[in-house]
Each structure stands twice: as structure tokens, then as C-alpha cells.
């Protein structure tokens, strides 16, 4: 059974079922159409590795492993395990990978790109996303900060479906350029004014008022926010969304 090692290029190889790599540097390696099985990286440095159409579902990263200038393309990264704060990915590219179940929240990503990857329903810490670029559809992702943490990311080429921003500053984030996305500033001040006047709106039913208040209160701590108005309309209806942005004193058509 083959192990990962530096300077090799292999296609459709069978790797050892469970392989432990400790304090190793592995570089300049290309793996294609292979099941890497269950590698455990303990304080390792991976540099300029290429995984193309590979299965890494059982990979584990621990003890300050670093992954630099690596490319993951059309690969299965589901359930890849990362110890909390024990892996740093720098200048890595992820393209058309399945990352659902991968413990992304435990790793730090610096200058990385994610293109058309699937990592639905994950919480990403803003402090661990540094100058990264995302492209494609993001579904049910939460970007979370500590209240003033800047999210330094480029999501210009993304569609945001069910994406939430909690406790993070979006001033350094490049918002989506695609249709139906709206970037709003001074959100907390807008919310405060909206909540003060919401009882004066005679067109609101009790049900809609409750939903509107709940939706606004979720934004009380945010200075900026990015909305996908089309997604909101699919959930709440066009009339409600129109009223929501009216109370925020901004138009959903100003995109």
C-alpha cells in the first residue's frame, strides 16, 4: 500500500488504510483519481500538493499542521476532521469539492479560494477567514464574529441562499455583484428607528408585525448586512420583503 511522500505523481493508486504522518514535510506531489483513505497528519507541513478527483473523507489534521499552496479539485472532503485551531491553510485552492461535514470552523484559511464548493450549513468564524475569495452558491452558511470582527472576504461572484452574518463587520467584505443582492450600511441605526415606528404601521397584521420585529432584532448588532432579496421573497413573500426594506429606509431595487 502506498503512502504519501514528496515528489511523486500518481494516478488511481491504492493508499494505506490508516497512515500516520508525524512532523513530516510533504511537498511537490500530485495525486489523481485516488482514495487517500485515512491519513492522520500530526504537526505536518503540506506544500504544493495537488489532489484531483480524490477521496479524502477520513483525513485528520492535528497539532498545528500547515497546508500551503495546495490544490483540491473535484475531491471529496466530507467529514475531514480538524482539531480546534490545529490547522492553517494558506494560499490553497478548493474547486468543485464536497466539503459538507468538514470541520471548517476549526481551521484558519488565509488567502484561499473556494470555487463552486459544497459546504452547506456550516459556521465559519470571521477571525479565521483572512482575505479569502468565494465563488458559486453559498447555502445556509453563517459567518460569525465577536461583535467587531472584520470579515475580510471577496464574495462578489457568489449567490447567497440562507447566508447569515452574525457579529461581524462587513466593511472589508466585497459583496455579491449578482442580481437580487443588496448591501446595506448603518444597519443598527436603521433597525433602531424601524423598531421605534413599527407600531405606527396600520397595514401590518399582528402576524406580520411579529415576524418583522423578529427579523429586525436579528440585525440590531450589525453595522452592515448583505441581503438576497429574491431568497427572502421565496421565504416571506414579495409584499413582506417590500415592507421590510421600507422600514429600514432603503429600497430593494437599489442594487
Which residue ranges define each predicted feature?
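Long, ordered, amphipathic alpha-helical scaffolds
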Residues: 171-255
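Tandem repeat scaffolds
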Residues: 1-193
Amino acid at each position: 500500500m502506498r503512502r504519501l511522500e514528496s515528489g511523486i505523481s500518481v494516478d488511481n493508486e491504492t493508499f494505506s488504510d490508516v497512515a500516520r504522518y508525524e512532523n513530516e514535510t510533504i511537498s511537490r506531489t500530485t495525486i489523481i483519481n485516488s482514495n487517500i483513505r485515512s491519513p492522520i497528519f500530526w504537526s505536518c507541513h503540506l506544500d504544493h500538493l495537488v489532489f484531483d478527483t480524490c477521496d479524502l473523507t477520513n483525513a485528520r489534521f492535528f497539532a498545528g499542521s500547515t497546508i500551503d499552496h495546495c490544490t483540491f479539485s473535484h475531491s471529496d472532503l466530507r467529514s475531514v476532521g480538524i482539531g480546534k485551531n490545529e490547522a492553517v491553510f494558506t494560499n490553497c485552492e478548493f474547486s468543485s469539492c464536497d466539503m459538507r461535514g468538514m470541520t471548517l470552523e476549526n481551521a484558519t484559511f488565509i488567502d484561499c479560494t473556494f470555487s463552486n464548493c459544497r459546504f452547506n450549513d456550516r459556521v465559519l468564524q470571521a477571525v479565521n477567514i483572512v482575505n479569502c475569495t468565494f465563488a458559486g452558491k453559498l447555502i445556509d452558511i453563517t459567518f460569525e464574529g465577536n461583535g467587531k470582527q472584520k470579515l475580510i472576504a471577496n464574495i462578489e461572484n457568489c449567490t447567497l441562499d440562507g447566508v447569515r452574518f452574525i457579529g461581524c463587520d462587513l466593511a472589508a467584505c466585497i459583496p455579491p455583484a449578482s442580481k437580487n443582492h443588496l448591501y446595506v450600511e448603518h444597519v443598527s441605526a436603521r433597525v433602531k428607528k424601524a423598531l421605534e415606528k413599527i407600531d405606527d404601521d396600520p397595514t401590518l397584521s399582528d402576524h406580520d408585525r411579529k415576524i418583522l420585529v423578529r427579523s429586525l432584532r436579528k440585525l440590531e448588532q450589525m453595522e452592515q448586512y448583505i441581503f438576497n432579496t429574491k431568497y427572502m421573497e421565496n421565504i416571506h413573500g414579495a409584499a413582506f420583503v417590500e415592507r421590510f426594506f421600507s422600514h429600514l429606509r432603503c429600497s430593494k431595487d437599489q442594487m
